[in-house]
């Protein structure tokens, strides 16, 4: 590092000097690359089985996890042993990565420790509990109580699991950089420099995490300040290497490499000082030229840490996610009695509609306390008079379209297939407006609505659907569209406002609330449907937390205070194995 060069800091204006940099990585994928937040899971038990003759049990808790699409359980970690108690409050916590969009299966096994052997078969089994991380997080106050099971005919007590988001995962930093005397790369002018930031991974590879704007025609650029989460920058590891590459922007995308330097969060946190002036080095030049020193310097101008309100703060404060499904019953799906139909009920495996419902629903249900889900259909003729409907209850009860859990939704779907006649057209607006009516009545942040539409075809009411989406973008709701079958889904891509915000009659959507994916992109070639469903859920749900937060921020809604944390009585002696 070099003694600080002075950077003049002009008033930044949004003019022709600034251009977005493209071609180095795909910034649309940055959000997907950001690691999960991390939560600390605490374990307590009450009324464990007493396996010791002359004293109480000496319990330990062992956590097992399952990889996505894999049935094998792997040991994740163990608590300490607490001597002589049936009501342990374990001190050692389990720290887990948390993804809203993934089903993270957990198994907690309890043992009475009888010796110092680490082999669990040498100790008495006290029972076990199965749950998901989403279940713990989604419970009131992120505190889940479940009965311990596993020993037939015996009451094994209760486990109490609490989840707390780690503070380092909630921080974001606002940083600004400038550079001095960068190499001139353009023949007829000065360089057009921009910075690309990468965080290092545990395997030594690097993942792009931020790209600055381009400052045109200067060797002494001052970039605009930018905000990035600590998770994205270094995954919460303050000593992890951060690599910064400096490029000269070219219109054709073949940006010229100027040089690079490395730093870490801990170094950057020192702020503006001689420690945060970096030599920009081009390794090729350094290897070829003996007199080469550097290709300029980059200086940190400011570094400010902010603690942000997170998705989990709202969930812990009691916000409920209300999940509604809407299924396409148009004739283009094919006769449900024929194996070629997308609605065919194969007794041995789920059809594409069933897989989409189950994949998304099984994750979202963890955030809904009553587990009652409205299930709607559209595009069918209904008995007894053949009336065409684009908003009918799958359970046949328009006054109460709620189904009990995802299994209840599946049952209502299968029953509907036997009673309605597939027809058309493919109209989305009625089901979007149905959910919007409920969402419009909730203005305090206590509920957020997610609508899953599963469809096979080309949308018929595009203008009305766009208008419905623009109106819904002001409400606490998100829309997931899963396209099944071989159709072209160009119109659906238009509704997914990642590139161009949806508009209707000159009005643009207030925020992007639609996520579309074609199911065929997720079918596992080996026939592993569990893996197909996990991949689908991961992609369609990944944007929900940010869409949720964008609504809450825009409305200035703060999370409700979480219920007081459970404070166990202090007691007992602790040992470890």
UniProtKB/Swiss-Prot annotation:
InterPro entries found in the cross-reference section: C2_dom, C2_domain_sf, C2B_Copine, Copine, Copine_C, VWF_A, vWFA_dom_sf
Residue numbers binding Ca(2+) 1: 52, 58, 112, 114
Ligand binding (Ca(2+) 3): 114, 117, 122, 124
Residues modified as Phosphoserine: 273
Residues annotated to bind Ca(2+) 5: 186, 248, 250, 256
Necessary cofactors: Ca(2+)
Domain annotation C2: ranges: 19-146, 155-278
Note on how the cofactor is bound: Binds 3 Ca(2+) ions per C2 domain.
Keywords, alphabetical: Calcium, Metal-binding, Phosphoprotein, Repeat
Annotated residues for binding of Ca(2+) 4: 186, 192, 248, 250
Residues reported to bind Ca(2+) 2: 52, 112, 114, 124
One Gene Ontology MF term: metal ion binding
Family matches, as Pfam families: C2, Copine
Domain VWFA: 322-523
Function: Probable calcium-dependent phospholipid-binding protein that may play a role in calcium-mediated intracellular processes.
Entry similarity comment: Belongs to the copine family.
Protein's recorded name: Copine-8
Organism, scientific name: Mus musculus (Mouse)
């Amino acid at each position: 590092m070099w003694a600080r060069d002075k950077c003049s800091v002009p008033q930044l204006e949004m003019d022709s000097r600034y251009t977005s940099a493209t071609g180095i990585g795909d910034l649309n994928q940055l959000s997907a690359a950001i690691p999960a937040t991390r939560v600390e899971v605490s374990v307590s038990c009450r009324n464990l089985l007493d396996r010791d003759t002359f004293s109480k049990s000496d319990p330990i808790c062992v956590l097992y996890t399952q990889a996505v699409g894999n049935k094998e359980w792997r040991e994740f970690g163990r608590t300490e042993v607490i001597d002589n108690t049936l009501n342990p409050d374990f001190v050692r916590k389990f720290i887990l990565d948390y993804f809203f969009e993934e089903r993270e299966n957990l198994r907690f096994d309890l043992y009475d420790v009888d010796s110092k052997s680490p082999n669990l078969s040498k100790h008495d089994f006290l029972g076990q509990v199965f749950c998901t991380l989403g279940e713990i997080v989604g419970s009131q106050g992120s505190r889940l109580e479940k009965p311990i099971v596993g020993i037939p005919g015996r009451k094994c007590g209760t486990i109490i699991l609490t989840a707390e988001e780690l503070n380092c995962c909630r921080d974001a930093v606002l940083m600004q950089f400038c550079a001095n005397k960068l190499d001139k790369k353009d023949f007829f002018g000065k360089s057009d420099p921009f910075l690309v930031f990468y965080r290092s991974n545990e395997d030594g590879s690097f993942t792009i995490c931020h790209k600055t704007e381009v400052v045109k025609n200067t060797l002494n650029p001052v970039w605009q300040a930018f905000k990035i989460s600590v998770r994205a920058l270094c995954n919460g590891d303050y000593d992890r290497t951060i690599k910064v590459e400096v490029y000269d922007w070219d219109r054709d995308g073949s940006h010229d490499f100027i040089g690079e330097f490395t730093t870490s969060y801990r170094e950057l946190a020192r702020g503006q000082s001689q420690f945060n002036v970096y030599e920009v080095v081009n390794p090729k030049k350094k290897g070829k030229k003996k007199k080469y020193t550097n290709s300029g310097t980059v200086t940190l101008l400011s570094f400010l840490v902010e603690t942000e309100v997170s998705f989990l703060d709202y969930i812990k404060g009691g916000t409920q996610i209300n999940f509604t499904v809407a299924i396409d019953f148009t004739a283009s799906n094919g006769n449900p009695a024929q194996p070629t139909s997308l609605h065919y009920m194969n007794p041995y495996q789920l059809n594409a509609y069933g897989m989409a419902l189950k994949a998304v629903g099984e994750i979202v249900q963890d955030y809904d306390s009553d587990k009652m889900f409205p299930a709607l259909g559209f595009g069918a003729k209904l008995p007894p008079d053949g009336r065409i409907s684009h908003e009918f209850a799958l359970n046949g009860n328009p006054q109460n379209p709620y189904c009990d859990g995802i299994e209840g939704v599946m049952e209502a779907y299968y029953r509907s297939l036997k009673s309605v006649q597939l027809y058309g057209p493919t109209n989305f607006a009625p089901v979007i407006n149905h959910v919007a009516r409920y969402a419009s009545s909730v203005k305090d942040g206590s509920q957020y609505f997610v609508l899953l539409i599963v469809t096979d075809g080309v949308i018929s009411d595009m203008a009305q659907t766009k208008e419905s989406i623009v109106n819904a973008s002001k409400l606490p709701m998100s829309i997931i569209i899963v396209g099944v079958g071989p159709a072209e889904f160009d119109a659906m891509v238009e509704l997914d406002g990642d590139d161009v915000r949806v508009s209707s009659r000159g009005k643009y959507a207030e925020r992007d609330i639609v996520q579309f994916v074609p199911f065929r992109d997720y079918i596992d070639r080996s026939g592993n449907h569990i893996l197909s469903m996990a991949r689908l859920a991961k992609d369609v749900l990944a944007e929900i937390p940010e869409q949720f937060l964008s609504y809450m921020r825009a409305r200035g809604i703060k999370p409700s205070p979480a219920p007081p944390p459970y404070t166990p009585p202090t007691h007992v002696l602790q040992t470890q194995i």
